Amino acid sequence: MAKHGAGKLLPLEGLRGIAAVVVMLGHMVRGLVPPGPGPLAPLNTLHERVLNGGASVTLFFVLSGFILTLPFGKDQRPARVVVAMLKRWPRLVFLTVVVCVISWALIWQSGDIYARAALVNHNWWMATHFNAPLAGADVSLVGALTDGLFGVFGPGDVHFDSPLWTMRVELLGSLVVFVAAPLLFLVRRWWVRLVVVAVAIMAVGTNPPVMYVADFLVGAVLGMLQAEGGLPVFSNRAAVLAVGAGLYFYCFSAGPVPVIYAPLKLLLPTANVAHYAWEASSALLMVALLGNPALNGVFGQEWGVRLGAWSFPLYLLHVPLMLSVGGAVLLLATPHVGVSVAVPLAAGMTLGLAFLLAPLLTEMDKIWTLGLGKIIRVPKSGN
């Protein structure tokens, strides 16, 4: 079977970007929309049924495992493993520090505006600084630098930006891939590879953050298939079926679910195992986009590439902006137009600023990454 060219990977950027937007929209609902009945109550239902942040984060992890595995298809030397490990923390830390400093500046400027906004929308997530309480935390510039450099990667400190909880998972999962991928490529029999991966997934268990390593291993398997030309080509009908199944698994919730999910809920009853369904979703969506020319063409267009490039900054920026700027808009607008109108205004301002800043952070990160690549490089074979 012919191998998929590097250009055929571009649709995954579009998929990553859409997943980031889903997370952002879900967080807008979770942090701004009042709980209980009311004009905006359908948004809470939409969040529960469609805007699945857990499935989106799983997709991020599976995509990371996929992309990080590909270079080892041609080079399994220990030198590549060492360089990959040395580069991973510096590669991630630049934007985490930048966003923690931005969040610190927003907190310094806006104070407890998020708490006052919570008195308007009666929203627990807003009241608790999006489940990252500031009480007792070091919210100084030094604290922001410490969190961005080390806290989010080690103990999982997320006082400044709660979505940064994914960073220690990203670092851990990446290191596992750097060790596992070259070893798995050396094993030529696929059934042995799959048995090893299945045992590893069972071994990591169902307790966070270690359980998310399974997502990276699923991505590694897909990456090995890609590197060895083993991903299938999908007809349009097969692609529709794969995407439909992928979306079915994507919308599966760790909480109450519609009757259509009853059989799946029996198999995956708790939050700690729900991500297995989301792994299946990620795999189905990825292979459909890579294997179907029509989907490949749609998601590989400029909009998808740009959105994918902005996805990480968007993911990191939106919550600090919502808690400060969004909270201020909610407070200022509610007396004049009511909560039902103020909430969309706050969400719109938050999302608009996130999309305005994301390209700048993307370019800054690109410069950082290029510089890092010049400093830490894989030695040529034979040197």
PLM regions and their residue ranges:
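Membrane-interface helix-loop-helix regions
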Residues: 45, 49, 97-171, 283
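Functionally critical transmembrane alpha-helices in membrane proteins and complexes, commonly lining
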Residues: 10-73, 93-96, 209, 285-287, ...
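Solvent-exposed interhelical
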Residues: 171-200, 225-236, 334-338
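Alpha-helical transmembrane segments and terminal signal-anchor/GPI-anchor hydrophobic tails
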Residues: 211-306
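Structural signal for the C-terminal ends of transmembrane alpha-helices
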Residues: 69-77, 105-110, 180-189, 220-230, ...
